[in-house]
Structures are given as structure tokens and as C-alpha cells.
Amino acid sequence: MVDISIIREWVAKADEDFEFALVNLKEGKPFVALICFHFHQSAEKCLKAYIVAHDLGFIKSHDLPALLKICAAKDPSLIQLSPDCEYLNTFYIETRYPVHWPTHFTVDEAERARSSAQSVKLVIEKNLNLA
């Protein structure tokens, strides 16, 4: 059995990313790309908490669909999170590094990222009996 404190630590870090993004979004901060990135990070850490909790073979990856696939091997119902993970996955590379194509994220996209991250967070935390 995995030490529950490790799982709680992953979830706490996910909560920090979510709350940081949420506060900045609500305050109308102009850093939309970073807000979207932190919503991605929240979902990533939730998925990793699930992987650790069920000893599913931790991998160093930021690819949400790949992490979700590992989680869904344990609980196929988690596949319902695929659209959210696919959407959030677009915010990892493009928000962190210079790219050679135009990138501009809107507040509406950040709101959708919030909704997707919240869906992942709620489903995973409920599944872990932490909600």
C-alpha cells in the first residue's frame, strides 16, 4: 500500500496550481498563457496522484492523454476525461517555450481550461476518496 501522505502531497500541489490559476483568472491578470499552464499542471498532478495511489508505474511525462491512459487501465470509466485532457494538453509546450507559430490564448480559453482542470480534479479526487 502506498503511503497516503504521498498521495495527499500530489493532490495538494495540484490544488496549489489550480488555485493560483483561478485567482489570477478572477483578478483579470493578463497572463492568460501562464494561467492555462497552471490549469494543465493541476490536472497533471491529479493524474499522477492516481498513478502513485494505484502503483501503476510512474512515468516522467507531461502528456495528459498518456497519463490518463495509464489511469484508465485501472479504471476504464476515467476515459470520460479524455476531452478535458486533450484540451489541457495544448497548454504545456506552447505556454512555456517560444514557438514558431502565433500563439495567443484568450480569457474564454482560460475559462475552458479551468473547467477541464476542475473536471479532472473532481473525478480523480472522488476516485481517490479525497473529495
PLM feature segments, named:
Residues M1-A131:
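Terminal alpha-helical segments
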